[in-house]
Amino acid sequence: KKSFARISGFEYFQLIRSEKIDQQGKDKIAVIVARGTIVDGVQPPGTIGGDSTSRLIREAHEDENVKAIVLRVDSGGGGVFASEQIRQELLEAKEKGLKIIASMGNVAASGGYWISANAHEIWASHNTITGSIGIFGLLPTFDRALNEIGINSDGVKTSKIDLSGDITQPLSEGLSKIIQSEIEYGYKRFIGLVSEARDIPIDQVDQIAQGRVWAGSSAKDLGLVDEIGNPVSYTHLRAHETVH
């Protein structure tokens, strides 16, 4: 049987992902694609890893020939920690004087907006879905499902406050209050960073946040987006303006 040369898709994309920015030439623009769910750690293409995406941004701002970063965002969000990790790396690039341009794809919502908010310019298309400025948390419990098949559990503890998060039991009132307070804190932090980054009063941000999603054109009217246009060609043109 005839065969052909081949390589696994995972190995191929890992090779591309790990390729460093060309060290030759000056006045370069680094284009970094952030596509997929935002999660912690090092992730393959198709998922935005807090460590791996931050590393790409770091490689860009540590290259003295790179003058601008275009962050191409196509993400519905993900984890707060990873999103903040990426945002902090972009802030480091800004501190070094690099121009940061966020180019939104089909979706740049929730965590996708979190990592875009501090860009010098945010570009989107008319139909980009963005916003979703909000925080939520989930804790699965299986007490009802287990009860249906006749499996029950019980136990003893030294406190009335149950913080164990036992998935075989209903969510306790104490743990529920703690989770709710963390969600509320995260939400205030989110609208606070958007308010500061976009220079919008925090009360106004709260009105347009609360998990609402907006089309790109509406987001521009609300001040969440700077420009509407081709999110690739126009963004590159504006990035070139900062270099030459």
State where each predicted segment sits.
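Small-residue-centered hinge/linker elements
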Residues: 1-100, 107-197, 238
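Active/binding-pocket-proximal capping segment
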Residues: 76, 210-214, 234
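Tryptophan-centric aromatic hotspots in well-structured domains and transmembrane helices
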Residues: 114, 214-215
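Short acidic-hydrophobic, aromatic-tinged amphipathic segments that line or gate anion-handling sites
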Residues: 124, 225-230
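Generic long, charged, amphipathic alpha-helical segments
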Residues: 206-208
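Single conserved hydrophobic/aromatic residue that forms the stacking wall/gate
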Residues: 236-244
